[in-house]
Amino acid sequence: MICVCLLMLMTPMAARADITLTFGTYAADKPTVTVKKYRPFLTFLSNRLGEALGEKVIIRMTVAKEYQEGIDQLASGEVDFARFGPASYVHVMKQNPGIQIVAMESKKGRKRFKGVIVVHRDSAITELSDLAGLSFAFGDELSTIGRYLAQSHLLEAGIDSDDLHTYDYLGRHDLVGEAVGAGKFTAGALKESTYKKLIAKGVPIRILASFDNVTKPWLASSTLPENVLLAMREIMLSSENEEIVRRVSKNGFLQGSDSDYDLIRDAMEQSQAF
């Protein structure tokens, strides 16, 4: 969805058009945290795009309540570009193969980082196999770490859904960690950065296991004009040393390709046996 807003001028000269873009994401953590995280970078990006395109660029932001809502918004062109988790990228490509990767987030120059499975700090559990007969908290049903990679990892340890006493999907990563810390579930899966934030807040959890994940892609809708996509990509790939960029991607961005997410496709396929 790309809108053109006309400036009303006091002269009969042709009005200059502003480019208005909508950025979309979903709340893997609290929505207020999500907005606070991205707004400064989006302001930076709109200014740089304006310089590159020679037109004023306005970027609006929308935060979907659920993963599927965010996926649908990008697939339909309701938003022009988005930041998704890897599994959401795989899903949105199935809905609209015209989606393109703008760039991937960098983790110290790499395209991989860690997801974690946690237990209560005082838990006696030392192995994933110890979870048989106990409870597990997953994130969203479409979450890369919170579902697909966690379930794949559990399967490798010989644990499937029938082996658990109970399990549930809690949505956000922070809710998973808090539930485990409160003793509502024996274990749960969340991203490492959220784990560190919860530890800093005093939530009594510890890491039982960790696993590789692929960094998040920034994606362009199939309707985003090519010149805007190319300008956005150039800005993101050349801005790794900008402090404002490090707020959303600590080490900047890398060139991305569809094959970077084969690890996730494999995990999603494996999780069907869970």
Residue ranges with predicted function:
Residues 83-96, 153-156, 178-206, 210:
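A ligand-binding cleft/hinge motif common to bilobed small-molecule-binding domains
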Residues 18, 22-48, 87, 111-177, ...:
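Bilobed "Venus flytrap"/periplasmic-binding protein-like clamshell domains
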Residues 55-72, 87, 161-178, 213-214:
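Short helix-initiation/N-cap motifs at beta->coil->alpha
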Residues 80-82, 89-114:
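Short beta-strand-centered segments that line the small-molecule binding cleft or hinge
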Residues 64-82, 95-96, 129, 173-185:
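Short helices/loops that flank or line small-molecule/ion binding pockets
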Residues 46-54, 75, 79, 155, ...:
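Sec-exported extracytoplasmic/periplasmic mature domains
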Residues 1-78, 246-274:
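N-terminal hydrophobic or amphipathic helices and topogenic motifs
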Residues 18-31, 103, 107-119, 200-242, ...:
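Periplasmic-binding protein-like
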